[in-house]
Every structure is written in C-alpha cells, then in structure tokens.
C-alpha cells in the first residue's frame, strides 16, 4: 500500500511539473469570483427581498449552492490567505488585517497572536500551482495577501496589491489603488474590473487560464453608482 501511495504521489508531482502532459481538455478554464464582505442573506436566491442579484441567482440556478459552508477566517486577508495557500490560519500566520491588537482591549477574549500581514514568499500559492500546469493566470481587483500579485504566481494584474479597500471616493476614477491605469473620468471600479476580465477571457480563450475576479465591493467605503442609489432609495426600509 505504501508503494502504491508513493507511485501515485510521484506521478501527480511529475504531472504537475510537465504541463505538456495535459491536453487542453484536461485543463478547464477557471474563473474564481470573490466578493468581499457579502452577506449570505444579501442574495436573491438566498431569500433577499431588498438586494437585486439576478446574475448570481442565475449562477445558483445553473450550478451548485453550498448551504453549510464556512470561510476559513472572519475577515479579508486571513480568508484570502487560506484560499490561495490551502492552509489554515495557524500555518500561514495571517490572523487578521493589520495588528491583532486592533479594537478595544477590554472586549478582547484572547491574547493577541503574532500576526503576519501577508503570505510568506515561501508559501506555494494556487496561481503558482496552476502556472506550473501551463495556465495563464490573472488577477482583477483586490489581492491583499502581498504587495504585488506577480510575485505570487499571477501573470497579469489589474488593481491588485496589499491594499484592502479602494480608499475614500476610490470606487470612481481617478482611482487610488495600485496597478491600474485611469481611463474615463468617473468610471466605476466594479465595471472596470468586470470589463478587464472579459477582455482577458476573450484574448486567452484558446489557452487554459485562471482568472481571479475579486471585486473591492461590497467592502467599505460603500459607494454606489447614482442610478443604483436612486433605485434602492425608493425601496421600503431605507
């Protein structure tokens, strides 16, 4: 049994280091959509009568919904660090955003743990693994687990850095985040990231690709397009 396990392990490792071993059909394109601070009850298919999420509702209808799933951490960077490393928080050391001494010490129930702001360079990330298998990798939007996604396995990056939010009035161009060029004044960041992702997909449709679309919204500061603000302001409960 040990010999069989060793052979299987060796074949898996060997295969990952030889992308030519796989055909295109063996390497499906991957689009990972990550929405920051979205409540599970804020989706139409989960019962929301206030927020309108028709496209996500259609995704849920055509795909699979996990109703007993949990994030590996309660806030931004730790959850992302676990997602892209496959490690629990004690293993990668990113316990919170900034200092673990944040907040009022009188309400603290634990002794603050030593905290790392970003993933250590020695940690093998999901994008690095996919690159070794022949994927073209891209990040659009929030990264928050390192200063530059290109040092952690990303080939193309738009708007991703160590910043956790776009800053005051930062959802509209001119932007205050890194690695993004300002184009049309007043452009909405969520729309820009979506359009950049679509362009990348069309350009790389013939190659296996990994696209991490990580919107800064609905993370604070809450800044919506005027047309949508008007739509929601007319609803009951505002």
Predicted features and spans:
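Sec-dependent N-terminal signal peptides
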Residues: 4-13
